[in-house]
């Protein structure tokens, strides 16, 4: 079922926080949670599955801070690819009978736009577009 069709006749339940759960699992202060998609994939996948099992229809990838200002192009591609794969594994493993969708979680760049900051609007658009393109290759 397409998400748009699901919205017409259902109440949508979303997942909850990822960062706080990763901290409970050992994420250290200052450590990027996005790296856990690669280094602790089973932990991230288990968190996603727990949300699906609890009845969430939409689970977000662990990519809130994943952007080209924080990570190299190679890192960003690996992180987002792994993040999408982790949620897909969780979706496949969950058998609660609910419809299950995946959302690409995109947070702020961490920079202010001009004139308050130094980031050009067009550069910000490209930063977000790159993240979306990488997420889209994962066929969310």
Cite the ranges covered by each PLM segment.
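Domain-level signal for soluble alpha/beta catalytic cores
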Residues: 1-140
């Amino acid at each position: 079922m397409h998400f748009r069709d699901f919205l017409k006749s259902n109440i949508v339940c979303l997942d909850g926080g990822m960062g706080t759960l990763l901290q409970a699992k050992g994420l250290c202060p200052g450590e990027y949670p996005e790296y856990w998609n690669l280094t602790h994939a089973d932990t991230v996948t288990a968190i996603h599955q727990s949300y699906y099992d609890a009845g969430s229809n939409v689970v977000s990838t662990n990519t809130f801070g994943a952007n080209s200002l924080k990570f190299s192009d190679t890192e960003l591609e690996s992180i987002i690819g792994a993040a999408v794969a982790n949620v897909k594994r969780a979706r496949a493993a969950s058998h609660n009978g609910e419809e299950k969708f995946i959302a690409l979680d995109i947070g702020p760049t961490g920079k202010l736009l001009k004139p308050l900051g130094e980031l050009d609007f067009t550069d910000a658009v490209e930063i977000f577009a790159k993240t979306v393109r990488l997420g889209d290759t994962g066929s969310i």
